[in-house]
Amino acid sequence: AYVRERKSRADLMAIPLDGKRWNRPRYAWETEGFAAVAAATPTTLWHAFRARAETAQNRRVAAQLLRSKAIAEKLAKALTPDVTELCVAQSLLPFLWRMGVLGGRRVTVLMTRLPMAELQARLDAAAHAHPDRATLADFRAPAAWVAAEDEALAAAERIVTPHLEIAALFPGRAERLDWQMPKASLRAEKPRRAIAFPGPSIARKGAHALREAALALDLEILVVGQDLEGGDFWQGLNVRSVARDSNWLDEAAAVVQPSLIEEQPRVLLAALAAGVPVIAGRSCGIAPHIGLTVLDDCEPATLIHSLAGLAHRLH
């Protein structure tokens, strides 16, 4: 919406691929009304295939960064000397900076996640506090890429984001957008006793904190998505695994996501739109909203305290 509202007919749009043409909703940007549209279609499809082929979480994240690097290198070729102002997706930012193509241009950054330096510092602190949670130390981006992103962000004229935490990192330069709320779909009244965890089941998403809370409060948990902590992670608890494309939200008494980091809280926004209570970490980046409880921290004791009243009603 930000780009659509500010574009002019003289502008160039450079995108990974035309999502409408290739039936890829994730890439379905509106391309009408631009002077020209450049795409990195073969590069994007090839690297997307390689990323999906990786089964280990750390290798998948590494493959996604390599994909962004390859796309940036391809799209940079579309930048002619007369382009003096750029609106850049954060995923491409460090690579464009290292190539030198941002120098001398006014840059606006569209941000959807914390800077890599901040993100990795949080994971490092959590890994130090909880050495038993091995996935907290899974992957770290190369130092040169982290430094390049920091330098590019420092040089950027404007930071555009709907994320509350990200906006707070850039006082005076951040333009905070509203999250795109899904269409409200209120549910029929019926007894619901399960707590939904949108997942995936991994430490950075708060899986360990919820596991301890479920044990302490005798909760039924709907686990959505992949289990990346190992097949016996939820053993001994009242847990049901459900497919992400199922109607699991209709079964949930509440949605709980005590994440250390959260980039795209689409599931939490969908739950709020449906009137489902949400308990989440500050990393969700959502401004105060009816039905939203934001945790001061994502430790088990804090989550147990927040869930205690709800657990009493469920029993």
Regions of interest found by a model, annotated:
Residues 49-58, 109-144:
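Acceptor-binding helix/loop patch of EC 2.4 sugar-transfer enzymes
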Residues 70-78, 115, 128-158:
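Membrane-proximal helix-turn-helix segments that form the acceptor-binding/catalytic region
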Residues 185-205, 211-216:
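Conserved donor-binding/catalytic core segment of Leloir-type glycosyltransferases
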Residues 246, 265-273, 284-288:
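Short alpha-helical segment that forms part of, or immediately flanks, the ligand-binding pocket
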Residues 253, 275:
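A short alpha->beta transition loop at the rim of the catalytic pocket in nucleotide-sugar-dependent
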Residues 260:
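Aromatic "clamp/platform" in nucleotide-sugar-dependent glycosyltransferases that forms part
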Residues 277-280:
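Short hydrophobic beta-strand element within catalytic cores of glycosyltransferases
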